Swiss-Prot record:
This is Putative K(+)-stimulated pyrophosphate-energized sodium pump. It is found in: Cell membrane. Requires K(+) for maximal activity. The record marks 169, 214, 221, 637, 648 as: Important for ion transport. The chain crosses the membrane at residues 3-23, 62-82, 84-104, 127-147, 154-174, 222-242, 247-267, 279-299, 302-322, 364-384, 387-407, 449-469, 486-506, 553-573, 576-596, 652-672.
């Protein structure tokens, strides 16, 4: 086994050992009093019940796709697909299991100090982060070694990761938002009870949803991004460089990224900063600096120049700036969110209008930055004289952006753990000071989640672009002629798909939320003593509604993302499929940014008012902001984040089925001719 494969697998194993150590640390902490443990037990059971049901359905999907791959593409690709799917499931399961233990321990720690609570919540998130990167590089390293570096087979691993990620993100998003919308509209607006009030029948489902969507779903999303970026770099690196330096560089860089993430996590955990945001930022910046310095040394050692370093640095810097810009559009410390809060004074309509405007504005700078990142990485690598080398540079920018994924996921998954801790504190009637600490941690979590979503969409654009280049190479497409009618048809259909996908997922949340609202209203009417706190609501019924709706509604969007590219390639040929991928990439990135940022801005405008601005809780402005937040929920937590996976999944499906499209593509064209 070549040394660079050994290094990458070893780094992955170290990440998994570190995750296990953090998990053990969390388990040893106190889980609080009996009431806290009872509530946490309900949340844990609900989350695990959902995962078991989801995985049961996904097993059937994995079997069907494996058989199709084995027959039409090859058993080797099918084997890689199975491993990618299983590892994606493992990453979600490990992360969710620990997150549902860390939440109650964070609430208990908040009774003692903010620092201790932050440490536990962040450690819980770090388990997810380390599981994602550890399983990612171990899986790719093993498959690369077993199949002798044949990337045609290893792309199957990416397909497995991507398809599970889409179902996890969509299913988790529908679950969490059905519960959230139901709990908010009936609980807050109609019944006038506060958030996380134990009298609300949907409150447990809402807290389960935080884990299902924002821990397992988000983890699977970034697992897929991480794996996809490495696979695209390896695929192009194999073509461009004869002596394996094109493969060696991304694998060793990913290994260094894991070590840098571990160091960053340790710094954040030991930080003495009073502001939780500063503590989290410390680790992120340290991890980023280690990767940039290492990339310079590595680039000079492997390639004898700094070209690869500049490509990697462009990706990492663009990712960090997009994260900061996302914060500026979604944090209540900046004018965009404050404007939405101001517009809430005149009712829900102006709240919605201003939120949509913020979402649209927020597409400008990320797209400009992604474009700069693409240009820099393409030309600095030598794309002017050799296009394939330039495209390899773009894939390195994606690897650079995702090199500290372990840290990104840790910071991102910390948010829902802190949110859950606040819910447990409220339901357990812990002192007001505890809720103040968890609220502070949660508000930082909202910002980190928004930054994470910005990072995810930026990396999705670069990863999909480099996978698209791999597809063009696999199907022997020299260029895509947009004056070609067939390509134009593909472009139109591709550009439409993110809107159709968004409509399906938004409608699914609406349907599921409707069921939830009816159930919560029924319980308020038919169970005497709920409002007085004398009777316990039927929490399980609401959990079951969310689970059933999420599983039912995730199937169509998921199947669509896989079937449409294959159908397009078979019916209209490789040029039309190339057009479809380009159209979906452009519109998917824009729709994803708009939805994620508009939703985040509405959410924080509501929190800004709850902090005392514009009349505070219970005011007319607050009621309007709650409506905005409710509309924004499926925007930012279901449809928006799903766009990243959609564009990457369609590209990797096309790459895996490229041999089939090359052999049988254009059936309809041949009939017409």
């Amino acid at each position: 086994m070549e040394s660079f494969i050994v290094y990458s697998v070893l780094a992955g194993v170290i990440a998994l050992i570190f995750a296990f150590m953090l998990s053990s640390f969390i388990s040893k902490e106190s889980a609080g009093n009996e009431r806290m443990q009872e509530i946490a037990g309900h949340i844990h059971d609900g989350a695990m019940a959902f995962l078991k049901t989801e995985y049961k359905y996904l097993t059937g999907f994995i079997v069907i796709v494996t058989v199709i791959l084995a027959i039409f593409v090859g058993w080797q690709t099918a084997a890689c697909f199975i491993l990618g799917a299983i590892f994606s499931i493992f990453a979600g399961y490990f992360g969710m299991n620990v997150a549902t233990k860390a939440n109650v321990r964070t609430a208990e720690a908040a009774r003692h100090s903010q620092g201790k609570a932050l440490n536990i919540a962040f450690s819980g998130g770090a388990v997810m982060g380390m599981s994602v990167v550890g399983l990612g590089v171990v899986g790719i390293g093993i498959m690369y070694y077993i199949f002798g570096g044949n990337m045609e087979f290893v792309t199957g691993f990416g397909l497995g990761a991507s398809s599970i990620a889409l179902f996890a993100r969509v299913g988790g998003g529908i679950y969490t938002k059905a519960a959230d919308v139901g709990a908010d509209l009936v609980g807050k607006v109609e019944a006038g009870i506060p958030e996380d009030d134990p009298r609300n029948p949907a409150v447990i489902a809402d807290n389960v949803g935080d884990n299902v969507g924002d821990v397992a779903g988000m983890g699977a999303d970034l697992f897929e991004s991480y794996v996809g970026s490495i696979i695209s770099a390896l695929t192009l690196g194999t073509v461009v460089y004869a002596n394996k330096e094109g493969v060696m560089f991304p694998l060793i860089l990913s290994s260094i990224g894991i070590v840098a993430s571990i160091i960053g996590i340790l710094f954040s955990r030991k930080s003495k900063a009073k502001d939780p945001q500063k503590a989290l930022n410390t680790g992120t910046y340290i991890g980023g600096i280690i990767v940039i310095v290492s990339a310079a040394i590595l680039s000079n050692t492997i390639f004898g120049n700094l070209k690869a370093f500049f490509a990697v640095a462009s990706g990492l810097v663009v990712g960090m700036i997009i994260g900061k810009i996302t914060e500026m559009y979604t944090s209540d410390a900046y004018s965009s969110v404050q404007k939405i809060a101001n517009q809430s004074e005149t009712g829900p309509a102006t709240t919605i209008i201003s939120g949509l405007a913020v979402g649209m504005y927020s597409t400008l700078w990320p797209i400009v930055l992604i474009s700069i990142g693409v240009l820099v990485s393409f030309f600095v690598m030598g794309g002017g004289s050799n296009a394939m080398v330039g495209l390899y540079g773009i894939s390195l920018a994606a690897v650079g952006m995702l090199s500290t994924t372990g840290l990104t996921v840790a910071v991102d998954a910390y948010g829902p753990i802190a949110d859950n801790a606040g819910g447990i504190a409220e339901m357990s009637e812990l002192p007001h000071e505890v809720r103040e600490i968890t609220d502070k941690l949660d508000s930082v979590g909202n910002t980190t989640a928004a930054i994470g979503k910005g990072f995810a969409i930026g990396s999705a654009a670069l990863t999909a672009l480099s996978l698209f280049a791999s597809y063009a190479q696999a199907t022997e497409l020299e260029s895509i002629d947009i004056l070609n009618t067939v390509t134009l048809v593909g472009l139109f259909i591709g550009a439409m798909l993110p809107f159709l996908f968004g409509a399906l997922t938004m409608e699914s949340v609406g349907k599921a939320a409707n069921e939830m609202i009816e159930e919560v209203r029924r319980q308020f009417k038919t169970i005497p003593g709920i409002m007085e706190g004398k009777a316990t609501p039927d929490y399980k019924k609401c959990v079951d509604i969310s689970t059933a709706a999420a599983i039912r509604e995730m199937i169509l969007p998921g199947v669509l993302a896989i079937v449409v590219p294959v159908a397009m390639g078979l019916l209209l040929g490789k040029e039309a499929l190339g057009g479809l991928l380009a159209g979906a990439l452009v519109s998917g990135v824009l729709v994803g940014i708009l939805m994620s940022n508009a939703g985040g801005a509405w959410d924080n405008a509501k929190k800004y008012i709850e902090g005392g601005a514009h009349g505070g809780k219970g005011s007319e402005a607050h009621k309007a902001a709650v409506v905005g937040d409710t509309v924004g929920d499926p925007f930012k937590d279901t449809s928006g984040p799903s766009m990243n996976i959609l564009i990457k999944l369609m590209t990797i499906v096309s790459l895996v089925f490229a041999p089939v499209v090359l052999q049988y593509g254009g059936i309809l064209l041949n009939l017409i001719k």
